[in-house]
Amino acid sequence: MALEQLCAVLKVLLITVLVVEGIAVAQKTQDGQNIGIKHIPATQCGIWVRTSNGGHFASPNYPDSYPPNKECIYILEAAPRQRIELTFDERYYIEPSFECRFDHLEIRDGPFGFSPLIDRYCGMKSPALIRSTGRFMWIKFSSDEELEGLGFRAKYSFIPDPDFTYLGGILNPIPDCQFELSGADGIVRSSQVEQEEKTKPGQAVDCIWTIKATPKAKIYLRFLDYQMEHSNECKRNFVAVYDGSSAIENLKAKFCSTVANDVMLKTGVGVIRMWADEGSRLSRFRMLFTSFVEPPCTSSTFFCHSNMCINNSLVCNGVQNCAYPWDENHCKEKKKAGLFEQITKTHGTIIGITSGIVLVLLIISILVQVKQPRKKVMACKTAFNKTGFQEVFDPPHYELFSLREKEISADLADLSEELDNYQKLRRSSTASRCIHDHHCGSQASSVKQSRTNLSSMELPFRNDFAQPQPMKTFNSTFKKSSYTFKQAHECPEQALEDRVMEEIPCEIYVRGRDDSAQASISIDF
């Protein structure tokens, strides 16, 4: 009895092994027949098969009921100048609700969840044919916690984009254009396409740059230059950034407007894709990539103060590798020192000679400026006298009389002699006053009085002149007696007395000053 039970168990095990082996052989045979078809293993979001011309995908557990509380996202991507057509099998059921608020299928025209909404679907009737306007389509399936259904199965294919039929569509193949970069940092630039002749002039550009960071590092991307020839026309030109691989589900950012922001990747592999059609070949970009690790930083790395640690070799290299310029902020002194050393080595002799010449000229100039004023002062002290000092600082008309010093001395001698004669005449004329009055009468007295008043009034008036006119040949005798000449024939004695009396104010003025006789004579002119 026990032997029979053991045989039965062995038979069951043998049958099970044969069934498993048969399934494995069948699977291998099917894989060999489907060359070029990529199978996505069964996951919580169902099966997704992709080919070069399209593919198909389904809801989880299809054709059985899908599980509750599920959310699956499918992003379809066609080649450039192509669009996507999406169809559903007739076996279709998603929990119906008003405006499909519960279980539903959401489809958008583009690669993002914020792309234009095509529609939301639910119920028992499968959607009609859906066609995208570009090369991307975003699809999301969502279920709530109750009332599950059969689900769906969809097929998609790629068709030529009618907007590019004049360029040949998919009949005009795009050349293969791929580049690879790696290391602590580097530059990704679109000009590399022309330099390496990856495409010919007039052809569209669809190039991919694959970046690999250093071990255990991530990638930071910063645009140094960016310009799209046709801004905001993503069909014609764009730059896309992928994180990890070039699969559409790894799309991190896409730029086709006028601004491109920095991108921080979560993996050590980044993919940059640039697309530009035949009419957008002037589009360009230049991007810096930097490998970084997260803190804490080691001794061989530099802390960027932005959750980044970069290699020490990137510090003060003239390029901003950190998100903020911490790695280049304290490098000014070092750069200036290096520049000074370079100038000293190459032009030290010229700078030294020039500096010496300038220094010598400066010293000579200072000595000349200091020594020249001292010579003038010494000369003045040596030849200084009161008369010369007075002549320099008195008004200019005093210098004119100093030039005629000899003539003035002779005139002063005559004046002194006349004054002496006047004194003698006055003493002798006292006794003969009556005789004098009898001959000249009261008229002479009035004339004398008027002459005396005239000379006394004339003196202060002439003293007010600041600068006398240039004098002619000096003749004091003629000038001082000219106004009495007309009356000399009437009374010679009175005329002589009047002439001498006119000089009395001048004599008083001369005696009242200590300067010289030059000032008294200048008043008469």
Curated annotation (Swiss-Prot):
Gene3D superfamilies documented for this protein: Low-density Lipoprotein Receptor, Spermadhesin, CUB domain
Glycosylation sites: 311
Positions where Phosphoserine occurs in the chain: 409
Keywords: Cell membrane, Disulfide bond, Glycoprotein, Membrane, Phosphoprotein, Receptor, Repeat, Signal, Transmembrane, Transmembrane helix
Post-translational modification: N-glycosylated.
GO MF, any single term: ionotropic glutamate receptor binding
Ranges that cross the membrane: 348-368
Residue ranges, Cytoplasmic side: 369-525
Domain LDL-receptor class A positions: 296-332
Pfam families tied to this protein: CUB (PF00431), Ldl_recept_a (PF00057)
Any one GO cellular component localisation term in the record: postsynaptic density membrane
Expression tissues: Expressed in brain tissues, including cerebellar granule cells (at protein level).
Topology, Extracellular side: 23-347
Residue ranges annotated for the CUB domain, each copy included: 45-159, 177-292
Subunit text: Interacts with GRIK2 and GRIK3, but neither with AMPA-nor with NMDA-sensitive glutamate receptors.
Role played: Accessory subunit of neuronal kainate-sensitive glutamate receptors, GRIK2 and GRIK3. Increases kainate-receptor channel activity, slowing the decay kinetics of the receptors, without affecting their expression at the cell surface, and increasing the open probability of the receptor channels. Modulates the agonist sensitivity of kainate receptors. Slows the decay of kainate receptor-mediated excitatory postsynaptic currents (EPSCs), thus directly influencing synaptic transmission.
Protein name, UniProt field: Neuropilin and tolloid-like protein 2
UniProt source species: Mus musculus (Mouse)
Record lineage: Eukaryota, Metazoa, Chordata, Craniata, Vertebrata
